[in-house]
């Protein structure tokens, strides 16, 4: 490719509305342009990178035994009604009617469509297992699209769906896909972690996320210092440290009219926050207990995913408002506590070990000091309610926990029969009876992978692609003063022809621009190998090679250049 024949839309300045580095660099490198909130045009440089990522995914999926198909973006509403997700999904699901007033959705995912397809196409257990995938556009009507393509409304996703006769067969394919994903993200050159994860709106019995480590990530990833344990913070078990100590002081009621929060309480009475307890009131799961108290240490954060798994807590978790609390308990939010509490309570493991702690007295303007379980109040049911923190023991008993930010780029699920049972997707079993198929699903956010790679691999000059395989061009030829030097032009043209013949993805910068502009643009878009051709160097029989990743510059004999590139460049 020649720059004179290419849409080379680089920007010198960073757009003001781009918050994260990947969004900034994708705009500056001419990869994307916004067309509406969360919607982007992909320009030639971006499309080249996107297609290269897709090809790596496609190659590894095919090696793993998956078969590529293509399903429509527009999906009939009745399939979503059949699975019950029409009501469950919420406003992220874009719904519309055609001219015949038939309801449709723009697909955020394709479980319903694939289940419908397979139940129509398969009839016998002999046709299973089967693993089908597509690389297709998705649409989720995000309330706040942000961070460029990291959280956009329209995006490209690889989604695969496997069908089985037994859970054991699903487990086998799940393990194959687990390894396929490892190969994909390793080939992409990403620093990633595989973590246990919540199944969320997709549902199912087990799932793993593939998280690219980056400070701009939206997820907290927990992992051990001494083992392979890793989990999304939503699922990481919080192990209580230490042992319960005996009471040392009598419980005392104190006036605290201006201490409605833990922070105010700690500041006014010079307390250690670790000695305080907070009481959160949430909606209950049944009419006999419409409100439930969740009791945590003052410095700990409620884990809503864990809490809503308790049978007394409504799912999804919802906090009671102040009026409900006042009507049921007779006290303002800032003065809630476990002593004389009139509703069922669940205590976090860490709180269960506390002694001589401080909490609201369930009387406005008052707190109790030196509360102790069993002596002052019966210990309620104990449950893991909190997020882990750095330094907690690893749940597997090996090492302590660290927490880093991550970008979720892949997610695999064991769906079981969630969709197949709801949609009556059966085949004839070995015994001749209808058999409900067991399912798995496996997703990769292709557009998000591009952004995640940039978040991990960049410098002050631009993008540094982690592998030649996904760079927009592998080699850039930068001839200095090409139109003033016949020798420079001739060598550049011949090198371009030779590399093209070898199948190298090469770009020749034949613009009438200053060398500094050409260097800056090639570094900005992340071309990993740059050949700089100057008249004086040619007279000495040399050209300059520059490596984008290391910044190293090397003078190479011009008659050895092709051999050098063959050794160091992946076509």
From Swiss-Prot:
Spell out the molecular function terms from Gene Ontology.
aminoacyl-tRNA deacylase activity; ATP binding; proline-tRNA ligase activity
- Family that this chain belongs to: Belongs to the class-II aminoacyl-tRNA synthetase family. ProS type 1 subfamily.
Q: How does it assemble?
A: Homodimer.
Free-text comment on this protein's domains from its UniProt entry: Consists of three domains: the N-terminal catalytic domain, the editing domain and the C-terminal anticodon-binding domain.
Q: Write out the entry's keywords from A to Z.
A: Aminoacyl-tRNA synthetase, ATP-binding, Cytoplasm, Ligase, Nucleotide-binding, Protein biosynthesis
What is the native source organism of this protein? Haemophilus ducreyi (strain 35000HP / ATCC 700724)
Function, as annotated: Catalyzes the attachment of proline to tRNA(Pro) in a two-step reaction: proline is first activated by ATP to form Pro-AMP and then transferred to the acceptor end of tRNA(Pro). As ProRS can inadvertently accommodate and process non-cognate amino acids such as alanine and cysteine, to avoid such errors it has two additional distinct editing activities against alanine. One activity is designated as 'pretransfer' editing and involves the tRNA(Pro)-independent hydrolysis of activated Ala-AMP.
What lineage, starting at the top, does this entry show? Answer: Bacteria, Pseudomonadati, Pseudomonadota, Gammaproteobacteria, Pasteurellales
Q: What is its main location?
A: cytoplasm
The superkingdom of the source organism is Bacteria
Q: Where in the cell is it found?
A: Cytoplasm
What general EC class does the enzyme of this chain belong to?
Answer: ligase
Enzyme Commission number: 6.1.1.15
Name the InterPro entries for this protein.
aa-tRNA-synt_IIb (IPR002314), aa-tRNA-synth_II (IPR006195), aa-tRNA-synth_II/BPL/LPL (IPR045864), Anticodon-bd (IPR004154), Anticodon-bd_dom_sf (IPR036621), Pro-tRNA-ligase_IIa (IPR002316), Pro-tRNA-synth_IIa_bac-type (IPR004500), Pro-tRNA-Synthase_IIa_type1 (IPR023717)
Gene3D superfamilies with a match to the protein in the record: Anticodon-binding domain, Bira Bifunctional Protein, Domain 2, YbaK/aminoacyl-tRNA synthetase-associated domain
Q: Which cysteines in this chain are paired by disulphide bridges?
A: none
What protein name does the entry list? Proline--tRNA ligase
């Amino acid at each position: 490719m020649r720059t004179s024949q290419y849409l080379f839309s680089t920007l010198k300045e960073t757009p003001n509305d781009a918050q994260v580095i990947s969004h900034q660099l994708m705009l500056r490198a001419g990869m994307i342009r916004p067309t509406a909130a969360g919607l982007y045009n992909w320009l030639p440089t971006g499309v080249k990178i996107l297609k290269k990522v897709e090809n790596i995914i496609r190659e590894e999926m095919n090696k793993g035994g998956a078969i590529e198909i293509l399903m429509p973006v527009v999906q009939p509403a009745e399939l979503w009604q059949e699975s019950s997700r029409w009501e469950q999904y919420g406003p992220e699901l874009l719904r519309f009617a055609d001219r015949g007033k038939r309801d449709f959705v723009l697909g955020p995912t394709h479980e319903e469509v694939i289940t419908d397809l397979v139940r129509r196409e398969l009839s016998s257990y002999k046709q299973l297992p089967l693993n089908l995938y597509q690389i297709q556009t998705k649409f989720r009507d995000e309330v706040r699209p942000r961070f460029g393509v990291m959280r956009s409304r329209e995006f490209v996703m690889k989604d695969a769906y496997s069908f089985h006769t037994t859970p054991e067969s699903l487990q086998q394919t799940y393990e194959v896909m687990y390894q396929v994903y490892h190969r994909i993200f390793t080939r992409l050159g990403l620093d990633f972690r595989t973590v246990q994860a919540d199944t969320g709106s997709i549902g199912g019995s087990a799932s793993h996320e593939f998280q690219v480590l980056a400070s701009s990530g939206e997820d907290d990833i927990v992992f051990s210092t001494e083992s392979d344990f890793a989990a999304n913070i939503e699922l990481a078990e919080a192990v209580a440290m230490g042992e319960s100590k005996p009471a040392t002081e009598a419980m005392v009621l104190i006036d605290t009219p201006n201490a409605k929060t833990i922070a105010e309480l700690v500041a006014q009475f010079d307390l250690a926050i670790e000695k305080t307890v907070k009481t959160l009131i949430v909606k209950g799961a049944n009419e006999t207990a419409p409100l439930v108290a969740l009791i945590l240490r003052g410095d700990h954060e409620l884990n809503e995913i864990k809490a809503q798994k308790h049978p007394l807590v409504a799912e999804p978790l919802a906090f009671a408002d102040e009026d409900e609390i006042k009507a049921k308990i007779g006290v303002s939010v800032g003065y809630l506590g476990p002593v004389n509490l009139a509703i069922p309570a669940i205590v976090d493991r860490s709180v269960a070990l506390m002694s001589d702690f401080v909490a609201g007295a369930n009387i406005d303007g008052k707190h109790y000091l030196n509360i102790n379980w069993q002596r002052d109040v019966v210990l309620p049911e104990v449950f893991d309610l909190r997020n882990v923190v750095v330094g907690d023991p690893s749940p597997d008993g090996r090492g302590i926990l660290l927490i880093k930010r991550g970008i979720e780029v892949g997610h695999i699920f064991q769906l079981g029969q969630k969709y197949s049972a709801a949609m009556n997707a059966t085949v004839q079993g070995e015994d001749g009876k209808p058999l409900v198929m067991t399912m798995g699903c496996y997703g990769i956010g292709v557009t998000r992978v591009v952004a995640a790679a940039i978040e991990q691999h960049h410098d002050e000059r631009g993008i540094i692609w982690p592998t030649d395989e996904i760079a927009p061009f592998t080699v850039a030829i930068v001839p200095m003063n090409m139109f003033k030097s016949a020798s420079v032009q001739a060598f550049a043209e011949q090198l371009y022809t030779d590399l093209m013949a070898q199948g190298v993805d090469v770009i020749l910068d034949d613009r009438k621009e200053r060398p500094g502009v050409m260097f800056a643009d090639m570094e900005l878009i992340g071309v990993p190998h740059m050949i700089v051709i100057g008249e004086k160097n040619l007279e000495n029989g040399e050209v300059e090679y520059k490596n984008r990743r290391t910044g190293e510059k090397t003078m190479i004999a011009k008659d050895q250049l092709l051999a050098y590139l063959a050794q160091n460049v992946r076509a």
